[in-house]
Structure formats: structure tokens, C-alpha cells
Amino acid sequence: MYAVIKTGGKQYRVQEGDTLRVEKINADEGATITLDEVLLVANEDNIQVGAPYIEGGKVSATVKTHGRGEKIRIIKLRRRKHHRKRMGHRQYFTELHIDNISTG
């Protein structure tokens, strides 16, 4: 069984037992959270598609850790002016462990 969920403006395909990194969620480490924006749930023989979400569809997950991703380096350059600007960015993430998928 797998599901497609939406969190942080992105969509993820998850199964029970998966570990994935999503945009930062304000929850304590070790806490259990419920993701209720479920777009699709599929078994071996049955597929449910929401319009836009499945009524009563829920995915339970445990927050494993919080952190910051790899650094992305940006260089802006103005040609012929000897002007350069270097910047970097590290995005915050939350690592989740998927415990249960239910259709309601």
C-alpha cells in the first residue's frame, strides 16, 4: 500500500516504514504527527484518488530529527563592472518515519 501526500508545498509518494525529508514542520523530535492532505491511496487492486483530498485519509508519521540540508552556493556577477556577490543558503528540513496509512 502506498499514498501520495502533500506537505510543505510538495508531493511525496510514501509507504509504511519509509523515511523521508520534508520541509520543516514545527513538532518535537519523537512526536507523532498526522498528515491529512492525502491525494491518493493505492493497494494492489484498488486506487483511490481524491478531489483534491481523500475524505478521512490520514498518514501517521513520527518525527525523527530536524536539520539543515547541504549548502547551495550562489554567485551573482555584473559583467564588465568587477562586481561579484557570493551567497549561500541551507534549507531546514524535518525527517519523518511513516508509521501508518489509513483511508478512513
From Swiss-Prot:
MF term (GO), any: structural constituent of ribosome
Keyword match Ribonucleoprotein: yes
Example GO BP: translation
Gene Ontology cellular component annotations, sorted alphabetically: cytoplasm; ribonucleoprotein complex; ribosome
UniProt superkingdom: Bacteria
InterPro entries listed in its UniProt record: bL21-like, bL21-like_sf, Ribosomal_bL21, Ribosomal_bL21_CS
Pfam families for the chain: Ribosomal_L21p
Parts forming coiled coils: none
NADP listed as a keyword: no
SUPFAM superfamilies on file: L21p-like
Record keywords: Ribonucleoprotein, Ribosomal protein, RNA-binding, rRNA-binding
Alphabetized NCBIfam families for the sequence: L21 (TIGR00061)
Family: Belongs to the bacterial ribosomal protein bL21 family.
Record-linked PANTHER family: 50S RIBOSOMAL PROTEIN L21, LARGE RIBOSOMAL SUBUNIT PROTEIN BL21M
Biological function: This protein binds to 23S rRNA in the presence of protein L20.
Oligomer status and interactors: Part of the 50S ribosomal subunit. Contacts protein L20.
Protein name: Large ribosomal subunit protein bL21
Originating organism: Nitrosococcus oceani (strain ATCC 19707 / BCRC 17464 / JCM 30415 / NCIMB 11848 / C-107)
Species classification: Bacteria, Pseudomonadati, Pseudomonadota, Gammaproteobacteria, Chromatiales
Gene coding for it: rplU
